[in-house]
């Protein structure tokens, strides 16, 4: 079950991340960003895009965030370095966006710790394997569907 938090003035976003190794994260994710890099050549922009995502969150003992560090250490020659990852974004208990990379690998990973807050944070930068498609779903409110 997904949990949603209410803040004064409205609902917070909520993320659910599912990785093919069995990892499911819901509570520790703070921010997700997606980007697509294309070539400057207009005629080939659609053929070779580089799709990336950056996930940041709190290092949590209740969820398997330590698995990100282990994933980042795998060399490119190891077939386990490629994983399927799905990110779902919810707002007001509705699925707003769902993006899946079917062959993702870690480009960069970092962890930061603070004595003042007592909480560690992680940043995971992943990219879709070259020339692989991504799946994306965008929610449309009922009044926009027709």
Q: What is each stretch, according to the model?
A:
Residues 1-146:
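Glycine-rich, low-complexity intrinsically disordered segments
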